[in-house]
From Swiss-Prot:
Belongs to the poxviruses L3 family. This is Protein FPV130. InterPro entries: Poxvirus_L3/FP4 (IPR005007).
Length: 301
């Protein structure tokens, strides 16, 4: 997942996501020239070496603009029984534990939670008990691209994976992560959320209003002929593709990895984006949409 752009409604010109990184590097520099851990380093956690590496990996995703909902790591110190991690501290912002059973949990918060779960899935990191923090931020408009899917949302809350979450390595299916959401049945019912087994199906069915309108126009494309290659074994979920439907080529997005027998599951719309269907296709009948990828991932809102 990559974060494209964000703008705030405060007087400052720097978007929140950029200001966050600016504050991080300033405080980290302050720490490096100091002989003690200052007041901004009071969020710490002692973990084994493996878990420390997972937190560092997630922090690196945020610094690279490929994720949003993980705490930045200031420093890692070795000790006899593992490592101590020093995390980002939002010194001028309210930070609370997120109660996912809150009656009025907004859709932008739900979207951020699922985006966090997707990043964990992509990096084969799991937890038996996911916990999240809510940080109050200036009202911001945030645009994220998740593979080829672009989502835009307004929010006054940054959702972070809580440092109280115990992480470990595990290669699991997408549904194992999404089970965290479907397990909260009251939330699913109140917000009219649909259970899915695939992340990109979740984004389309439950956050349709957050998908960039420019991106949705892609689902209106129909062609009789293309000269792009077939997809291959390494094609990832969330890739824009052409599929054959009633002698026409229409746009879809892959939901699954390509199976050993060269089958891939694709979600597509035959009416331009109003009703979506899911089918399995042979890779012989699915073609890349390279000429549209730049258009979909370079949206700057």
């Amino acid at each position: 997942m990559s974060k494209n752009n964000a703008t705030t409604e405060s007087n400052r010109q720097i978007p929140f996501t950029e200001q966050r990184l600016c504050d991080y590097y300033q405080e980290r520099k302050r720490y490096e020239i100091s002989c003690y851990i200052g007041e901004y380093f009071n969020i710490r956690k002692q973990v084994c070496i493996d878990e420390a590496n997972y937190w560092v990996t997630l922090s690196a995703l945020v610094k690279a603009g490929k994720a949003l909902g993980f705490p930045l790591v200031y420093s890692v110190k070795d000790h006899t029984y593992g490592r101590t991690i020093y995390f980002e501290y939002f010194k001028n912002m309210k930070r609370t534990n997120l109660n996912i059973n809150t009656v009025c949990l907004t859709k932008d918060i739900i979207l951020q939670i699922v985006a966090i779960l997707y990043s964990l899935y992509k990096n084969n990191i799991f937890s038996d008990d996911f916990k999240f923090d809510l940080v109050s931020i200036p009202r911001s408009t945030i645009s994220m691209s998740i593979n080829h899917l672009v989502l835009l949302f307004n929010t006054e809350s940054l959702i972070l994976l809580s440092t109280n979450t115990h992480l470990y390595k595990s290669e699991l299916s997408q549904s194992c992560y999404l089970d965290y959401m479907t397990a909260h049945q009251d939330l699913m019912t109140r917000r009219n959320l649909k259970s899915t087994n695939y992340f990109f199906e979740w984004f389309i069915r439950n956050h349709f209003e957050n998908i960039s309108r420019q991106y949705l126009d892609i689902f209106k494309i129909k062609k009789n002929y293309i000269n792009t290659p077939q997809i291959h074994r390494l094609t990832e979920p969330g890739s824009l593709v052409y599929v054959m439907y009633n002698d026409a080529l229409i746009m879809g997005i892959t939901l699954s990895d390509v199976s050993l027998n060269n089958i891939v599951r694709v979600i597509y719309s035959i009416d331009g984006g109003n009703i979506f269907e899911i089918d399995d296709f042979s890779t012989n009948d699915v073609f890349t949409a390279k000429e549209l990828i730049t258009r979909s991932t370079n949206i700057n809102l």
